C-alpha cells in the first residue's frame, strides 16, 4: 500500500494496520496537518495490561509524528460494559471503583505519552462528562433514530452472543450507541477526526463514523489494528499467573522483562516491530539470528519493551541481573514466589508448586516437565512426580531455586509469620 503520511506509513510497515475507512482521504489529511485522534479505554481494572499495549504504542507514535493523541477514559461507558469479544456480561462496578481505576490507568499512560496543553500533547478526557447527564428521551430522538437495529444485529459483538444463545442485556446493546456518540462529542469539543481501536471494534467505530455523517459533521475516520496473538494462538498479555499488567506494583518490572524474554522464537520479529522503537533495519538484523543466537534478539526485545514501560535505568539493571542469573549462576535477580510455611511443613507436592507458582498451567504439563527431566530444585533434576518440598529444604538457605527448563526460574521463599 502506497501511503504519503508518515504516521500511516509507519503503522503499515510495523504491522499495526488492519483496515480503515476512506484511507486515501485520511492519508492526505494526515500528511498535511495535525489530526486529533482518540483511543478509548474502559475503566474495568486499576491498570492496563499488555493486551492494550498496541493501542498505547500508537498513542505514542501519534505524538511522535505530530498528531494529537486523545485518551478517552470510559468512566461513563464502563457502567454498561462493552460486549465486544465477550461471552457474558461484565460484573457491574460502582462509581468509586470506576474512578479509582481511571486514576490507575492515567498513571500508566503517563509513562508512555506526554500530557499537556501543547498542540501535540496528550489530552485526557472522561466520557462521563457528557454521558452521566444525558436526557434519555432527547438522546433517543437525536441520536437513537440514526441507528438500525437490523444493522446492529449483524455486528459480531451482538451476533455471536445471540448465536451462542448467551445473554445480551439491553444495557450492553446500547454500548454501540454510546461509543458512537463519544466520537461525535469529541469532534464537537476537540475537533477529533479519527478513532483507532482493535479489529474487534470495527463495528462500533464505523457506527461512529456513520453517525457523524448523518449529523453532517466534518468527515470522521476510523482505523483498526490487527489482533495480536502469539504463535500458539493465545491472546497477548495473559500468563498462568494472570494478566501482564503495565504498572509495577501489580506486575513487577523483572517479571515484565521475563515475559518478553520468554516469548516463542516465531514471535520475536513481530513483537520487536510492535512493542519496541528499534528501527526496522535493526529488527531485520535480529530476525536473521537462528538457533541459540535468537536469545540475543529476545533479550533485546525484553530490554527495549521494559525501557518504554518502566524506564531505561530499570530495564538495563534487569538485563544485567538476568545476565548474572542465566550466565553466571547468580540468583539475585530472580523473581520470588512465597509459599505458606504450614503447606511446606506438611510436604508441598512439586506438581502443585509448579502450578500455583505459575510456571506450569496444569498438572499434566507439570508431569510432562518432570518426566522430560526439565524440572530442577536448586539446579538438581527432579525425577519423581511425587516429589515434595519440605522445611528441610530451607534449613541452610532462605530460599529454594525452582527451575523449568533453561529459561524459567523462581526463588521459592517461606511467608513470614507474624
From Swiss-Prot:
GO terms for biological process: tyrosyl-tRNA aminoacylation. Its EC number is 6.1.1.1. GO terms for cellular component: cytosol. Keywords: Aminoacyl-tRNA synthetase, ATP-binding, Cytoplasm, Ligase, Nucleotide-binding, Protein biosynthesis, RNA-binding. L-tyrosine binds at residues 38, 175, 179. Residues 348-413 form the S4 RNA-binding domain. Pfam families: tRNA-synt_1b. ATP binds at residue 238. It comes from the Bacteria. It catalyses: tRNA(Tyr) + L-tyrosine + ATP = L-tyrosyl-tRNA(Tyr) + AMP + diphosphate + H(+). The keyword Transferase does not apply. The keyword Disulfide bond does not apply. Its main location: cytoplasm. Belongs to the class-I aminoacyl-tRNA synthetase family. TyrS type 1 subfamily. Homodimer. This is Tyrosine--tRNA ligase.
Amino acid at each position: 500500500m502506497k501511503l504519503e503520511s508518515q504516521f500511516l506509513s509507519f503503522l503499515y510497515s510495523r504491522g499495526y494496520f488492519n483496515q480503515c475507512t476512506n484511507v486515501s482521504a485520511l492519508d492526505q489529511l494526515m500528511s498535511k496537518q495535525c489530526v486529533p485522534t482518540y483511543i478509548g479505554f474502559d475503566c474495568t481494572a486499576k491498570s492496563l495490561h499488555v493486551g492494550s499495549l498496541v493501542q498505547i504504542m500508537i498513542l505514542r507514535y501519534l505524538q511522535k509524528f505530530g498528531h494529537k493523541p486523545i485518551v478517552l477514559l470510559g468512566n461513563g461507558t464502563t457502567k454498561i460494559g462493552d460486549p465486544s469479544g465477550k461471552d457474558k456480561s461484565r460484573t457491574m462496578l460502582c462509581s468509586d471503583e470506576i474512578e479509582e481505576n481511571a486514576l490507575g490507568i492515567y498513571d500508566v499512560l503517563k509513562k508512555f505519552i506526554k500530557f499537556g496543553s501543547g498542540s501535540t500533547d496528550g489530552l485526557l478526557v472522561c466520557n462521563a462528562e457528557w454521558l452521566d447527564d444525558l436526557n434519555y428521551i432527547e438522546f433517543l430522538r437525536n441520536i437513537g433514530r440514526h441507528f438500525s437495529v437490523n444493522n446492529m444485529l449483524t455486528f459480531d459483538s451482538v451476533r455471536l452472543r445471540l448465536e451462542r444463545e448467551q445473554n445480551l442485556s439491553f444495557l450492553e446493546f446500547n454500548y454501540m450507541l454510546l461509543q458512537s456518540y463519544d466520537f461525535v462529542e469529541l469532534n464537537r469539543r476537540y475537533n477529533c477526526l479519527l478513532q483507532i481501536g482493535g479489529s474487534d471494534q470495527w463495528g462500533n467505530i464505523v457506527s461512529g463514523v456513520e453517525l457523524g455523517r448523518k449529523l453532517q459533521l466534518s468527515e470522521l475516520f476510523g482505523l483498526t489494528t490487527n489482533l495480536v496473538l502469539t504463535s500458539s494462538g493465545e491472546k497477548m498479555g495473559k500468563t498462568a499467573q494472570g494478566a501482564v499488567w503495565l504498572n509495577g506494583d501489580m506486575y513487577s518490572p523483572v517479571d515484565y522483562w521475563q515475559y518478553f524474554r520468554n516469548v516463542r522464537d516465531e514471535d520475536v520479529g513481530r513483537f520487536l516491530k510492535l512493542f519496541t522503537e528499534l528501527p526496522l533495519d535493526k529488527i531485520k538484523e535480529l530476525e536473521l539470528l537462528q538457533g541459540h543466537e535468537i536469545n540475543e534478539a529476545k533479550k533485546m526485545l525484553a530490554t527495549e519493551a521494559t525501557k518504554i514501560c518502566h524506564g531505561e535505568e530499570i530495564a538495563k539493571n534487569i538485563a544485567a541481573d538476568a545476565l548474572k542469573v542465566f550466565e553466571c549462576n547468580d540468583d539475585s535477580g530472580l523473581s520470588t514466589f512465597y509459599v505458606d510455611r504450614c503447606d511446606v511443613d506438611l510436604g508441598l507436592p512439586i506438581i502443585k508448586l509448579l502450578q500455583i507458582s505459575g510456571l506450569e498451567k496444569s498438572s499434566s504439563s507439570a508431569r510432562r516437565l518432570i518426566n522430560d527431566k526439565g524440572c530442577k530444585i536448586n539446579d538438581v533434576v527432579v525425577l519423581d512426580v511425587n516429589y515434595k518440598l519440605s522445611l528441610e529444604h530451607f534449613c541452610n538457605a532462605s530460599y529454594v531455586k525452582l527451575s523449568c527448563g533453561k529459561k524459567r526460574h523462581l526463588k521459592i521463599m517461606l511467608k513470614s509469620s507474624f
